[in-house]
Design a protein with these regions (language model features):
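Chalcogenol-based redox active-site neighborhoods
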Residues: 1-149
Length: 149
């Protein structure tokens, strides 16, 4: 996320905090990362009731190494873009989303994407259509489906 003490970030991080148990229930860990220092994270935590709800790790990237590695660093501003990355157990990025700095992300949708990524990892011959939810029908790609959807 771009930075501590701004406007959209606390709403996103609180949204994740509210669903943290659901992410853990599906075997997913959350890490929030900004280019701030851990001292700034601590000050923000102490000052904000929203941030005090957070139980997941808040990582500091003051050298911008992680932001650069994920290709979300904005050199001119010294901050990261607003990005979410789903990394599978093998360490491969299987889904990502990068939003404009003034548009917040949705934790419910991120959880749905995590579950969809887990489903297709377990069922390699099936895909999850738009708005797929756990338990809903999936698709099995085949020549028979071409032009039928």
């Amino acid at each position: 996320y771009p930075a501590d003490f701004n406007f959209v970030c606390p709403t996103e991080l609180e949204d994740l905090a509210n669903l943290y148990g659901k992410f853990q229930a599906v075997g997913c860990e959350i890490y929030s990362v900004s280019c701030d220092t851990h001292y700034v994270h601590k000050a923000w935590h102490d000052a904000s009731e929203r941030i005090q709800k957070i139980q997941y790790p808040m990582l500091a990237d003051p050298t911008h190494c992680l932001a650069k590695e994920f290709e979300v660093y904005i050199e001119a501003d010294g901050v990261a873009e607003r990005g979410s990355f789903i990394v599978n157990p093998e360490g491969k990025i299987v889904a990502y989303e990068v939003n404009a700095g003034n548009v917040g992300r949705n934790a419910d949708e991120l959880l749905r994407k995590v579950q969809a990524c887990q489903f297709v990892a377990e069922h390699g011959d099936e895909v999850c259509p738009a708005k797929w939810q756990p338990g809903a029908e999936t698709l099995k790609p085949s020549l028979d489906l071409v032009g039928q959807l």
